Design a protein with these regions (language model features):
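Catalytic core of nucleotide-sugar-dependent glycosyltransferases
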Residues: 121, 134-160
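Nucleotide-sugar donor-binding/catalytic module of glycosyltransferases
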Residues: 1-138
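Short, charged low-complexity intrinsically disordered segments located at boundaries
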Residues: 58, 134-140, 173-182
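Membrane-proximal basic amphipathic "stem/tether" segments
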Residues: 151-182
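Generic alpha-helical structural signal
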Residues: 25-28, 143-147, 165
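Short, conserved alpha-helical segments within structured domains
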Residues: 77, 100, 142, 160-167
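A broad, low-amplitude sensor of folded, mature protein cores
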Residues: 60, 104, 126, 146, ...
Length: 182
C-alpha cells in the first residue's frame, strides 16, 4: 500500500481475474461520478481447473450498520478504496492470518463508516482454494479470528446469530452458483 502510486487501491489475487477488460475503467468512473471513498461488487468462485464451472456466487448488497454482525461482508477482492482511506482506517493487521480482510473491512465499514457504492455486477472470478478454502481446521481458525476482530474493534455480535447467518449466506451462494449453471 505504501509503495502504490494510484489514488484508488484494489487488490487482485494472483489466481483471480476480472470478468471484463473494462472493470477498472468502470470502477474509476464510479469514483468520479458518485463521490464515494469505496466501491465493491459481486464475485463468483470458479473451479480452479475448469473456470467455466461456477462454485459459489457471492451476491453482495449495500453495506448497512450491523451487516457484519449478521454474517454479511462484501467480497474483499472486489473492494476498491481511495488511498486516503488507509490513512484514516489503517492498513491490514498482520496478526490476522486467516481473516485479515474481514478485520480490515470491519474497520472500514462498521467503525469508520466509509462512504461506499455497491456496484451490482460481478467483476471478479476467484478460483477456489487459498488459505481458508474449505479445510475445516482453517475455517475454524478463521472463525476464531473473526470473533477476535469483533472483540478488538468493540463491535457487539451475537455469536450464534452471526454463524447462523453466515451459514445461510454460504448456502445461498452455492444455490445461486447451481442456478447459474442450469
Amino acid at each position: 500500500i505504501e509503495i502504490s502510486t494510484g489514488k484508488i487501491i484494489g487488490f487482485l489475487n494472483s489466481d483471480d481475474y476480472y470478468t471484463s477488460a473494462y472493470v477498472l475503467e468502470h470502477v474509476a468512473q464510479i469514483f468520479e461520478t458518485e463521490n464515494v471513498d469505496a466501491v465493491y461488487a459481486d464475485l463468483i468462485y470458479v473451479d480452479e481447473i475448469n473456470t467455466a464451472r461456477v462454485v459459489r456466487y457471492w451476491k453482495s448488497k449495500k453495506v448497512e450498520l450491523l451487516n457484519f454482525s449478521c454474517g454479511f461482508i462484501p467480497p474483499h477482492p472486489t473492494l476498491f478504496l481511495r488511498r486516503e482511506v488507509y490513512g484514516r482506517v489503517g492498513n491490514f493487521n498482520p496478526n490476522y492470518r486467516f481473516s485479515g480482510d474481514f478485520e480490515f473491512m470491519l474497520r472500514v465499514f462498521e467503525i469508520h463508516k466509509v462512504h461506499s457504492f455497491y456496484l451490482d455486477e460481478t467483476i471478479i472470478k476467484m478460483r477456489t482454494g487459498g488459505a481458508t478454502g474449505g479445510n475445516l481446521v482453517s475455517i475454524k481458525d478463521q472463525n476464531i479470528e473473526i470473533l477476535r476482530a469483533f472483540k478488538e474493534n468493540k463491535v457487539e455480535v451475537v455469536k450464534y446469530l452471526y454463524f447462523t447467518c453466515k451459514a445461510i449466506n454460504r448456502i445461498k451462494q452455492r444455490l445461486r452458483a447451481f442456478l447459474c449453471m442450469l
